[in-house]
Amino acid sequence: MKPSKLLAIAAVIVAGAATTINANDAVYYARGSQLVPMQETDISVSKEVLTFTLGDDGYALVDVQYVFNNAGPAKTVKMGFEATSPYNTGDEPNPAGVHPYIDRFTVEFNGEKLSYTNSLVMPPQPDVPEEFLQYTYVYAFDAPFRSGENRVHHTYRYRMSYGVSNAFMVPYWLTPAMRWANKQIDDFTLRISVPKTEKYFCLVDTLFAGAEFKVIEGTGKVRHNQFEWSPTVFEIALRDGTVEWHKTNFVPSDDFTINSVDCYIGFDESVPVGAFYDRGDYFVIHPYDRKIRKDIARNLPYASRGYVFKRKDLQKYFEQFFWYMPDKNYVPGSDELTPREQRLQREGR
């Protein structure tokens, strides 16, 4: 199939399409104008440190640091950062291969900044009809591997996904790591950081069952939980801090998503108002209990920051929520509220 025809099909699929961006680094060879995934036989992944920084502006910063070991002679390998096409955004596919919701992409190899090229790639889909083929944006670079240890560091920013019942979603591909020689990550660390904000999120525990998430900075709580409509998850509340998961000999058998907790409780009318809260623009209060809504709307921003309420009924109300983490030293100030929180304050008057 010619590349021009591939792009024409992609336009049909993606048009009318929420922002979903998945990513990891993989190995490719070039076939015409296309990049084709391949298996690397000499180079293994010794270490990966993957860090997400979540903000209230709707963006996530991603920092990935790898240590690779090349058991063979020096060689140049084409590596690629993969990101799926946006879904339900109405964006046409970009023939230049630049993803519309990724920016600030950088890559360093053994301390040297590398240039990269952009491509649209069709992953292997042998059983999918032509009209339903899916496409991937790839940021590709030539990595000059020397024999022995090599280090790769890349960063980028992308707009987080969201939905009717999701304030934010951060999907990520881990499975491309299986294309390297050892078919595992010898030493893997996942960090999720929320500087100067609070985030309440969860990750399905299937992939992460071999270890526990730990709060290593700031204020936070972690527990295993299963909501009425959810699989078993790691439920995490984090304020101005970082949570970490670490595993050796990690086999990434699946991909994962960092989901805001409202994805499991957003449509449950039995859940109290305020059971989920986020400071970002896509947080919505579902007015199932209008009698208390104004008090809750007005005070949610301060509860998020740990305010200890003088009104006993309010204090008792917020104490029922896992995300509420009291801080007796916190003194509220209206100038610290996000634009969305200022609107909540006005709604609660």
Positions of PLM-derived features:
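N-terminal, polar/Ser/Thr-rich
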Residues: 21-58
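Bacterial N-terminal signal peptides
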Residues: 8-17
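Ligand-binding face of N-terminal immunoglobulin V-set domains in extracellular IgSF glycoproteins
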Residues: 63-84
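A surface-exposed beta-strand-loop module
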Residues: 105-169, 233-255
